[in-house]
Regions:
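Short, well-ordered beta-strand segments enriched in hydrophobic/aromatic residues
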Residues: 57-63
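Jelly-roll (double-stranded beta-helix
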Residues: 1-46, 50-56, 67-72, 76-78, ...
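A cytosolic small-molecule/anion-sensing beta-strand core signal
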Residues: 85-86
Length: 200
């Protein structure tokens, strides 16, 4: 019985905390400047801001030679499209591996697990070239917050706490846990992370 009370308390606290102390989302209008860059050395990716139009951000991604790229993941609400400007990119979409070269296009639909990486000795450059290639500003902001943690600490508890506090701003679900389970875990961990000073 005591264990049930403890579990109940752990699950109820997030609800109470979020009602009493609602999280204020960051103000992201005109947040990014043209030419601004941020890098994930662990993934071998540098992103450069081309422009921000309201809540839409257009970027250029450069994958270093032999870049591992991000872990396999999917976006529940975001479609990801981008053009290959130079180099040859390897990617995986719903379990199937492919390659695409300069002049090609990538389309990762919402809900589709995917990954991209570079197996060559040359850089691969991807760019938002069409109107539909925008990335939601909340997602780009989340990457801007997470990349320094990945750079210095790798996949640590601190980084996971940050992901939980960012919550729906960071529309990314790693391969493995069911999306609904991942959402619940983030909701449970978020108030505890906020108590310890983690901010979005």
């Amino acid at each position: 019985m005591l264990i049930l009370y403890i579990i109940g308390g752990i699950l109820i606290l997030p609800v109470i905390y979020n009602l009493l102390f609602p999280l204020k989302k960051p103000e992201l209008n005109n947040y990014f400047k043209t030419g601004q860059t941020y890098t994930s050395t662990g993934e071998g990716i540098t992103q450069k801001i081309l422009r921000q139009e309201g809540n839409k951000v257009f970027c250029e991604l450069t994958l270093a030679p032999h870049a591992a790229g991000p872990p396999e993941h999917m976006h529940e609400h975001m479609h990801e499209t981008i053009s290959v400007v130079s180099g040859t990119l390897n990617y995986k979409l719903n379990g199937k591996e492919e390659q695409v070269g300069a002049g090609g296009r990538i389309n990762f639909p919402a809900g589709a697990y995917h990954k991209m990486w570079n197996t060559t000795n040359n850089e691969v450059v991807l760019r938002s070239e069409k109107p539909e290639d925008f990335v939601p500003v909340e997602f780009v902001y989340s990457l801007d917050q997470l990349y320094p943690l990945m750079q210095s600490n790798g996949l640590t508890l601190k980084m996971f706490a940050k992901i939980c506090v960012l919550d729906e701003l960071f529309d990314s679900v790693p391969v493995g846990p069911p999306p609904v389970f991942f959402r619940i875990i983030k909701k449970v961990v978020k108030p505890y992370a906020r108590i310890f000073g983690v901010k979005p």
